[in-house]
A protein has these predicted regions:
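Conserved core segment of the aminotransferase class I/II
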Residues: 225-310
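Residue-level detector of conserved catalytic or cofactor/ligand-binding positions
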Residues: 314-324
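N-terminal small-domain helix-loop-helix segment of the aminotransferase-like
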Residues: 3-107, 115, 296-302
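Short, solvent-exposed loop/turn segments at secondary-structure junctions
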Residues: 43-48, 79, 110, 133-134, ...
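Conserved core of the PLP fold type I
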Residues: 68-196, 210-225
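Short, conserved catalytic or adaptor-binding loops enriched in Gly and charged residues
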Residues: 30-32, 96-97, 223-227, 267
Length: 324
């Protein structure tokens, strides 16, 4: 008889967003006259179609698959070089230097923020903001890791800060935060980087909503902070930036500077460990998707996406009457 991972007994039977979707569906079926009045606070899907340049790129990539000279089969697990360079160029336009070799392309930030836990022992202490994206808690609960919560409240502007009395090995930060939208400024992020460096911790930084930052003084990447490449992994996605919720594209930055000492005294690179994990368990994001995503990261592509983002930002007022 197999021995089961009994940590699954400690997670709820249904994932939060799946449960919200189920309840909404039941309500729609029982109240069809009110279905169009529902304000959905679940997974937060997009409603606008993919942009013109992305659709054109998808057609180009599909057509290339019909010609033997341009057909693409298995690709590199880390992602095609052209796509990783496009991402690095996007970082550069925002004043941040990221080595394309540190970028790993995947099918969603959900996958990577969940799978990254495989690099860390289950006896780590994990620090998680509350409220935040539920994947962080569920995946670490499934692993059996100890979770400590740091409360985001109105008093701290929903941006919890380091507490020197708390020792954490793994720190999750999400900025802009899902679901509050609160964003850390440079001084606040520096405090977190300093804390991580002092305590030999790793920050898992989710920047999936970075394109929604309108204040130019706010950092769109943790790598805007000196020392971050020695203590932080960054996750980002095109789900909300470019409407890729159904198309699926994300990227994770694991700097080569990110090294820790194993219990046997060996120095291990998280970059090399993640590369080994991905090459074993992931066959790469489809070429067609990467080709289209690379178009997003051009100046023209981002300008088109920004129009959609401005539309979504204009809808924020809808939630105002529901706030306490």
């Amino acid at each position: 008889m197999p021995k089961l991972n009994e940590n699954y007994q400690n997670v709820k039977d249904s994932y939060l967003f799946a449960e919200i979707a189920r309840r909404v569906k039941v309500y729609e079926e029982t109240h069809p006259d009110k279905a169009d009045q529902i304000i959905r606070l679940g997974i937060g899907d997009v409603t606008l179609p993919l942009t013109k340049s992305v659709i054109e790129a998808l057609h180009e990539a599909v057509d290339s698959q019909a010609v033997s000279e341009t057909f693409m089969g298995y690709g590199p697990e880390q992602g095609y070089e052209f796509a990783r360079k496009a991402i690095a160029d996007y970082y550069a336009r925002n004043g941040i230097e990221v080595d394309p070799a540190a970028i790993f392309i995947s099918d969603g930030a959900k996958s990577d923020t969940g799978n990254i836990t495989e690099l860390f022992s289950n006896d780590n202490v994990v620090l998680v903001p509350d409220p935040v994206y539920p994947v962080y808690v569920d995946t670490n609960t499934m692993d059996g890791k100890k979770i400590i919560y740091m409360n985001g409240t109105e008093e701290n502007d929903f941006l919890p800060m380091p507490d020197d009395k708390v020792k954490a090995d793994i720190i999750y930060l999400c900025s802009p935060n899902n679901p509050t939208g609160a964003s850390y400024n440079k001084e606040q992020l520096k405090a977190w980087v300093d804390y991580a460096l002092k305590n030999d911790s790793v920050i898992l930084y989710d920047s999936a909503y970075e394109a929604f930052i309108t204040d130019q003084d706010l950092p769109r990447s943790i790598y805007a902070i000196e020392g971050a490449k020695e203590c932080a992994i960054e996750f980002c996605s095109l789900s909300k930036t470019a409407g890729f919720t159904g198309t699926r594209f994300s990227y994770t930055v694991v700097p080569t500077e990110l090294v820790f000492t194993a219990s046997n005294g060996a120095t291990l690179s998280l970059h090399d460990m993640w590369n080994r994990r991905q090459s074993t368990k992931f066959n790469g994001t489809p070429y067609i998707i990467q080709y289209a995503a690379a178009r997003v990261f051009t100046e023209e592509g981002m300008a088109e996406c920004q129009q959609n983002i401005e539309y979504y930002l204009s809808l924020i007022h809808i939630s105002e009457p529901t706030r306490p």
